[in-house]
Amino acid sequence: MGKKDASTTRTPVDQYRKQIGRQDYKKNKPVLKATRLKAEAKKAAIGIKEVILVTIAILVLLFAFYAFFFLNLTKTDIYEDSNN
C-alpha cells in the first residue's frame, strides 16, 4: 500500500519535467534536429572575445619584434649625441 500512495504524489518539479517531456515528444524530427544543430553550433562557435585576444597578442609580439630590431640596429647612440 505504501508504494501506491507514494507514486501518486509527485513534486511540482517532477510534474513540470514530465509535461516538458510530453511536449518535446510531440515535436517532429526536423524541429528536434534543427534545435540540436543550433545548440551545437552555438557551443562550437568562436567568440569575439577570443578573436580580439589573439589579435592583440599578435600585435604585441610584432611590436616587441619591431622595437627590438629598431633599438639594436640604430646607427647613432643616444648617449654619444648628448655628450657632444
UniProtKB/Swiss-Prot annotation:
Localization: Endoplasmic reticulum membrane
GO CC terms: endoplasmic reticulum membrane
Signal peptide (residue range): none
InterPro entries, sorted: TRIQK (IPR024842)
Transmembrane segments: 51-71
Entry membrane topology: Single-pass membrane protein
Alphabetically ordered keywords of this record: Endoplasmic reticulum, Membrane, Transmembrane, Transmembrane helix
Pfam families named among the record's database cross-references: TRIQK
Domain remarks in the Swiss-Prot or TrEMBL record: Both the conserved triple repeat of the QXXK/R motif and the hydrophobic region are essential for its activity. The hydrophobic region contributes to the endoplasmic reticulum membrane localization.
Functional description taken from the UniProt entry: Plays a role in cell growth and maintenance of cell morphology.
Family (UniProt): Belongs to the TRIQK family.
Protein name: Triple QxxK/R motif-containing protein
